[in-house]
């Protein structure tokens, strides 16, 4: 909503400065978004007279002008300024607008300087209206009347120094879509005296010859009409044109400008028909299928029964409450007019506007609701303006429907102010505030009766009245009161899955990976490659064709990001994402997952090249990433099992079957997968490989058993030096190293403090179907140093246990 300061003062008698008015508007809920003060922009521009204009010696289309800007020399003689001008209307005696060097020209976004044009010095500029951004006219420089005072400031003389205020209205404040309503609120906030003159009815001189029929009162609760004969339409007066141009509206003619003025001044949209172009009487009805209307915007709209229209005997003439028709529009030949003031269904106006794609000032106000009691007074006010500006004789009013709404009264306990806002406002102040806002307060006890004005349809209850009082008193007066916390929460603030999500992010970031955040939607092709693509996961209205399905995995998005980086020269990436994936349309099919992707030399040992050599990422890096997530999320490390593609059920097809594995607890609870992505999948995704990745389902990690809280035991540092023994076992190639480690650990958990794999060998000296796995076993004595016999005994048990569980034998 835009308006000028002078326009506001038409309704508010105030001497308050602009800054204070703007601050108060924001404080009372009418947020000021922008103030355009053209007086500062136009300050350097002055009125000047062209004393002489001669042909430029070196250019056919330029003239050298001597300009009188009102300045004088030390002797009191006029001091003329030389300006080179290319405007076709530059001539001797012309009064125009002059800009001296150093002036910023808004229409060209340049700052003037003293220049030389084709060998002739120019010390300023004569300006066109387009260069000042006051109109689109750029055919010549501005021509001012002969009596314009030379040397005076142009903005002040032309009335362009009026600041334009733009406020952001909330949808409930339809009463402030007019300057009149804004002034009312400011008067309640002690910013001045509200001007609310009585609108006197205009006496009709003859019956209105056009009758009105409302077929559906739910679409049109009220409709008022009046004819004015013998009008003379033409340009509107200067004051009205300035009002409209100041807020960005283009003056058209007096009749149309009056309706636009009423829309912004009193929040009362109107429409004016050329009465001679209307055939018969008017009917407010639903449009019929296939009916069309060429509206005032020049577009042809095809209508249906959901659209409310104003029709005559010939057909549709107007889209009710939104836009009039071109055929019955007013022009300079119009002599008889029909002025319409009506009430429309807010819901129907909004639906019709959206369906037809029309955003008009009338729609903006009608879909929020207008003052029903101002329907007829608005018609009277518009009639008087038409008669003052265009002349003519008015008819009597024709009113159809119920124009006046029922009275609304609220029983308002004054204690509600203290209860809801924690401030004390005396009854005298309550009466003053509500009275200035248009409410009527009756009674003097603890409970008063408040009559709601017709223009405040948003006020429905006691809390709304408290809000009205508080916003005028000042929201800054409401004390800060903390909520009563009661007992401290006993349960953790974060849920288990929230805690796991946070820990997973930290663990992967600590491993040098960079977090990515992708859409939860991917293309159908990507979804099918990663086990999705079912119809129940397809979006009914996707925002793009490549975002059509809910993602079954986080990896497609990471692959796309990795390839995008590679295309820009950053091939070595280490990425991760933590987010939701979807395996079905039920709540039980939605999981929180953590996934990561490595490429090139972005291994877990570090990203980028190094003087000591750089190994490329492999499946073991992806495994380490997955295990880091599981450890951070609290997965039981001793229970984790690695299963190959042949051992795990439903192994995903997007992984390389020989270079990947599943992580599970038992045969049925698969926590995730790691390894190299299948080359076929990468080809489908147009991504360069190899890519190593993992995905862990955080929801499937079993909850740790709750144990009674107890103090940690005293730290016992071993008094004796540990002993390390190395073993190399020959086993089948299908045997997992983890099985050998587990077998060694199970020999004696009190003595065996650690088992690690330090070598795996396949090749010369080893059968083709065998491999050598070397482990280091750490033995920690507790109460005394081991003897050689005791160490050999434990070593024998380790060899026997490994042979029993894996069929392996010591390498000779």
Swiss-Prot record:
Binding, Mg(2+): 458, 464, 467-468
Record key words, sorted: Aminoacyl-tRNA synthetase, ATP-binding, Cytoplasm, Ligase, Magnesium, Metal-binding, Nucleotide-binding, Protein biosynthesis, RNA-binding, tRNA-binding
InterPro entries membership: aa-tRNA-synth_II/BPL/LPL, B3/B4_tRNA-bd, DNA-bd_dom_put_sf, Fdx_antiC-bd, Fdx_antiC-bd_sf, NA-bd_OB-fold, Phe-tRNA-ligase_IIc_bsu, Phe-tRNA-ligase_IIc_bsu_bact
GO cellular component, one term: phenylalanine-tRNA ligase complex
Biological-process GO terms, alphabetical: phenylalanyl-tRNA aminoacylation
Enzyme class: ligase
SUPFAM superfamilies in the cross-refs: Anticodon-binding domain of PheRS, Class II aaRS and biotin synthetases, Nucleic acid-binding proteins, PheT/TilS domain, Putative DNA-binding domain
Domain FDX-ACB: 718-811
CDD domains: PheRS_beta_core, tRNA_bind_bactPheRS
Names of the cofactor(s): Mg(2+)
Top-level lineage group: Bacteria
GO molecular function: ATP binding; magnesium ion binding; phenylalanine-tRNA ligase activity; tRNA binding
Family: Belongs to the phenylalanyl-tRNA synthetase beta subunit family. Type 1 subfamily.
Subunit structure of this chain's protein: Tetramer of two alpha and two beta subunits.
Official protein name in the record: Phenylalanine--tRNA ligase beta subunit
